[in-house]
């Protein structure tokens, strides 16, 4: 009987250990398959948004209003920008202009 209790305790502990992953940071964006993901990000004022190029091609992250502008990001590179005021900021990849998305800061 004691071995059944011990087995149950060990199984319950193993199920909870390492089973969950942290949720993605709401300020993280991905560049993959010639698109920004997610296409719309909403963050609070003061958030730094990080765009990670997970694509096999270089891309840029350039705001329509000129607020931020990355250099060409090669595969594996990241661009970060801290949003200090509220608003909706549209951005584009200037190399592939069909790639568009936005950040809404509240």
Residue ranges and their predicted role:
Residues 2-106:
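Extracytoplasmic copper-binding redox domains, predominantly the cupredoxin/blue-copper superfamily
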């Amino acid at each position: 009987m004691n071995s059944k209790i011990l087995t149950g305790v060990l199984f319950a502990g193993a199920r909870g250990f390492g089973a969950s992953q942290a949720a993605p940071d709401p300020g993280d964006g991905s560049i993959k398959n010639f698109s920004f993901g997610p296409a719309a990000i909403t963050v609070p004022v003061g958030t730094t948004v990080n765009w990670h190029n997970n694509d096999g091609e270089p891309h840029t992250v350039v705001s329509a209003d000129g607020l931020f502008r990355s250099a060409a990001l090669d595969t594996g590179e990241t661009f970060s920008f801290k949003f200090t005021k509220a608003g909706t900021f549209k951005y584009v990849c200037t190399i592939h202009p069909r790639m568009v998305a936005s950040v809404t800061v509240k």
